[in-house]
Amino acid sequence: MKVMFSAGEASGDTHAASVANALKEIDPSVDMFGMGGTLMERAGVRIVYDIKNLGVIGIVEIVKSLPKFFKLRTYLKRVMMKEKPDILVCVDYPGFNMKLAAVAHELGIPVLYYIAPTIWAWHSSRGNTIRKYVTKVASIFPFEAEAYRKYKCDVEFVGHPLLDIVHPTMTKDEAEEYFGARKEAKKILLMPGSRKQEVLSLLDTMLKSGEQLMSNHEDIQFFLPRAHTIDRSELETFIDAHNVPVTITEDHTYDLMQICDVCLAASGTATLETAMMELPTVLLYRVSPITYGIGKMVVNVSHVGLPNIVAGKEVIPELLQDSVTPQVIVSLVEPLLTDVEKNKAMRSELREVHHKLGEPGAVKRVAELVYNLGKEKCNE
């Protein structure tokens, strides 16, 4: 059986790799290929297009990159025609993957969409398009599954994949030793995003905040887990321009999260990961003014951060656009560093978010759906 994956971002690479590993447990002979990154490659997926070449995040940025996406879709269509996969697994990246799903449908290839478009948040009309082109939606939120059912899509709630992935592998003492963390130091985690554009937009501000925090605390450490879509040298160039000693880490991010006091995170999957590790977080979100303005008109949710959307209220503070300044960041971080009760209170609310996400096993359930759909096509 042949399985084609399409993931366009670091988080999608992570989730696709988990499914690929689970598929190998079901059938070690499965042939997997597609668009992705290093984690998918390690999981045994032949990478036909490396996602390092992607990385736009807003409407304006997407418009500028349209010619590249048209060429990529044409290239992947040729790959499909040559490889003849039994199923296409689209993972997140809806602006591109929706178009690729239409191509697969045209070629008679079943499509499973995992981490599907957020029709519950915006662009609900996509529900009709998904019903037309997608064979099965593997939904990660219960309220999301209900939204898809309203459009008569074939959807199955599988649970959230992070429940299978997010957990420490070391004790706190072991993690402190591994990362060179001082027990008494205040420890801040910096997660500026997985796309170069996010990093360009947010890391400079994070580091300026770090400079102010260093003047307030004698013993403070900063850690930055490197997304595998960002070169280490690019991060080092940014960091060298500031008087902030940052430890760039390459692995064991969840072990790192359990020893940190506060996280500054770009909006996205990282905020749900920190929620599941019960790490107090300040969310930062900044895109072009045009992208933000259009987004405000079409998005129908009251929060940006996934933990807040799941909770139905603000659990972690959200700084948007012009509010993303060192002064405002420091004003929110300081109480979480100095007020033990405030820190504990946020951790308690994040624990509730964790509970609302359901039970582990999502990855295995998705792999079984992929395998069964692919086998049906394979046996035709």
What are these regions (language model features)?
Residues 1-380:
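Nucleotide-activated sugar donor-binding and catalytic core shared by glycosyltransferases
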